[in-house]
Amino acid sequence: MAAKKVYLSPSTQQANLFVVGGITEEQNSNLVTDILEKALRNKYGITVYRNSPSMNLSQIIADSNVKAPDIHVAIHSNAGGGRGCEVYAYLISGKVTNSQKLAQYIYNEFSIITPSADRGIKNGITANFGEVINTTATAVLVEMAFHDNPDDTAWLIANRQACSTAFEKAICSYFGIAYIPDPLPVSTDYEKLNREAQSQIASLQSQLTTINQELTAEKDKYNKLVASIKALIS
């Protein structure tokens, strides 16, 4: 089977400042995309294309259409006073489009991890999102959460890995690929491990010292008792 091709399009909106954290929508979306791109390439052999922060919308659409990916995923965060995730898809009345299927997979994964109620799958055509309308690939635009809400913003900053994993799982589901979990992290903080080991050794040594002292005291009591018995007998 030919390798799947994905175009990742993190936000290029440099002026959209997060309400906390001193970071922009563009920066955060790219940090999530960095993790996602690595996972798709290394774990599944997916061909990943990506926009550049210097591109404008027309250039992004043109670049995606030239690359001809299977899917185009625009990764954004939202503003306007709300909370939660919403996904924009190419919706056609009376028909379930591939864009809608992809949007549903992504929305399902984000609904599990977001800290508030989410906002549903919406029509990217009526919203006039060029990346949904004018790309030739199956396309969605994802608003992960609201960067003008303090709680959503803090969540976005703290959960980039979780957001990437949500995209990864959804893309796997759409392509019919088995999701591969990341291995559990192995500690490489040898100094910390050594400190913990030394602490445990010291604790055991202290317990042994206490036991020896108690045994010595019991032995002394026994010897005195034996001496008393001998004195009585004699």
Predicted regions and their residues:
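Loop/turn elements at helix/coil->beta-strand transitions in domains of secreted/extracellular proteins
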Residues: 2-5, 43-47, 67-72, 113-117, ...
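Active-site-adjacent mobile loop/cap segments within catalytic or ligand-binding domains
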Residues: 4-9, 13-18, 72-82, 120-183
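A short, glycine/acidic-enriched catalytic loop
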Residues: 15-25, 78-105, 109
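Extended alpha-helical stalk/coiled-coil segments
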Residues: 185-231
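Mature extracellular/periplasmic domains of secretome proteins
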Residues: 58-69, 129-135
